C-alpha cells in the first residue's frame, strides 16, 4: 500500500504504535517474511538488520514494526476453486481451507470465503470468528472452466479495502486456468501494488505428486510451476503442494504463522510515477527474505489504522 503522508517523530517507540503522518509525501509500506535455511521463521530482527532497495537504490526506513508490537490481527480472503478440473479434489480443498480457519484467533482475525469457476462468488462476507466453511460448500459439484488469475486479482482488490496491515489471499486450487483475461504477470502487478501477498495451496492427488512422502513438497506439478509460482513470489507469498491430510494441516499453520510474524517496514517513495522494483535484504545474515517485488507510484490509498 502507498501512503500520501509525511512522517512526524513520535514520543513513544515505533514498536508500540503505528507511524504518524501528515499530508504531502508518499510513503510505501512493506510486509516482510524472514526465514532461515531450514524454513524456520525469524522474528527477532530490528530495523537495522534490513536493507530496502527501490530501483536498486538504498532507502531509509521511516517506520518499523515486528510481530511483537502489538499482537497483530489477520485479514484473509480464502479462495476455493470449484471449476471442473477440481472434480475429485473438493474434499481436500475444503479440508485445507478449514485448517486455515481453525488456526485463526476468533476474537481478532477476520476472514471471507470466495469460490470461483469463471466468476467470483462471496459465500462468507468478512467477519471475525469464522471457523468453518458454509454448509453449502459441502454439496458443490465442480463444474465449468477456470478463471484462476482473474479470481485472484479480484479477491486481492477486496482485501485492499480492509483496514489493517496483515492481509493475504489464500487460494486452494489445482493450478489450472483456461478462461482468465488477466495474465499471471498482470495479477502479480495488481496484488504487489496494493501489498496483498498471495499464497497458493496446490490441491493435488498423490499420483500427481511423486514426492508426496515429504511433508510439504517443492512445486513439481506443472500447473503450479512457472508463471503461477512467480505470481505468488512476486507478491511476497508462495506456492506449496498439499497432497495429504498432514500436509494440509501443517501448511495451514505455516501460512498463518508467517502472516502473524511479518515485519512491517515503511520508507519514503521517490515520488516518480510508474512501477518501482523493490528488494529487501537482511544485512550480513544467511536468511531468506520475502516481500512484494515492487509498487506503482501515484496509486496511493489511506493508511490502515
Regions found by a protein language model. Give the residues of each.
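Bacterial N-terminal signal peptides
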Residues: 1-9
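Scaffold/interface architecture of coatomer-like assemblies
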Residues: 11-305
